[in-house]
Amino acid sequence: MAAAAAATYFVFLNLSVEYEYLFADGGFSVDSILGKARRKKTFDCDKEDVRVIAPANSYVLKDYEKQGMKVIDCTSHNAGADVYALISQKGAQTTKVLFEPGDKMKAAMRRVFPRKFI
């Protein structure tokens, strides 16, 4: 009985997932914070790998989306959230990252990527 309770506690502890977005020197990374204790690198790309950054429902993304593209969802899944998509390409691997940037991050991305930020 105690083992089941302990297992349930650890499962529910890991269900609490928060995301931290870091945009510095043109590079973008996302860390997952599990149970408010453990940090795990979820995504990382360099400035040269970014193809486009646009709202997730933008028609511009249709030109970049490919079959077999890896999609990483780093959103809160809250209704009405301002979700953006970043498309990056490293070699043959194309990745789409869904995230919720704040106003300061959007302004910084617009400064660094004036032609890639929609």
What are these regions (language model features)?
Residues 40-48, 95-101:
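Short amphipathic beta-strand/extended segments with alternating polar/hydrophobic composition
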Residues 42-62:
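Structured surface patches comprising rigid loops and adjacent beta-strands/short helices at the edges
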Residues 15-26:
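A cytosolic-side transmembrane-helix exit/cap motif
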Residues 71-118:
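A membrane-cytosol interface segment of integral membrane proteins
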Residues 62-74:
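Charged, amphipathic alpha-helical segments
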Residues 26, 33, 48-50, 55, ...:
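Generic structural motif
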Residues 1-16:
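Alpha-helical transmembrane spans
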